[in-house]
C-alpha cells in the first residue's frame, strides 16, 4: 500500500538539506524561522557555540495583544521585533534559514520586515 508522506516530515528533510550549507558564525549568525498553525517563531543562532542570541515570536508579551495567529501581519511584527532586538545586541549581518519552508507568504513577509528594520541578508 502506498502511503502519502507527511508534509512536516518532507519539510524536515528539506531543512536538513539546507542546513548542510547554511551555517551561522559569531560574526554572521543564522536567522531561523519556524511557523506552526497558530504562531511564528524566529531565532538568531550562533551555530559554533549552539546558542540562541536573540528570539522573537507571536507569544512575546510585546506582541501578545497585537499579533493574532500565524498570518502575514503577525510575521511582519515578528520580523521587526527580531531585527530591533538584534540591532540592540550589535548584530547587523545574518544568514537567513527558511527552515525548510517555501520562501513565500509568511516566511517572505518576516524576512522583508527584518530587512526593512535594518538586518542585512
From Swiss-Prot:
One Gene Ontology cellular component: cytosolic large ribosomal subunit
Cross-referenced InterPro entries: Ribosomal_uL18_bac-type, Ribosomal_uL18_bac/euk
GO biological process, one term: translation
Task of the protein: This is one of the proteins that bind and probably mediate the attachment of the 5S RNA into the large ribosomal subunit, where it forms part of the central protuberance.
Coiled-coil features, chain-numbered ranges: none
Subunit-level organization: Part of the 50S ribosomal subunit; part of the 5S rRNA/L5/L18/L25 subcomplex. Contacts the 5S and 23S rRNAs.
Annotated CDD domains: Ribosomal_L18_L5e (cd00432)
Gene Ontology molecular-function annotations: 5S rRNA binding; structural constituent of ribosome
Keyword Nucleotide-binding in record: no
Keywords: Ribonucleoprotein, Ribosomal protein, RNA-binding, rRNA-binding
Family: Belongs to the universal ribosomal protein uL18 family.
Gene3D superfamilies: 3.30.420.100
HAMAP family: Ribosomal_uL18_B (MF_01337_B)
Gene: rplR
Pfam family, one: Ribosomal_L18p
Protein name per the record: Large ribosomal subunit protein uL18
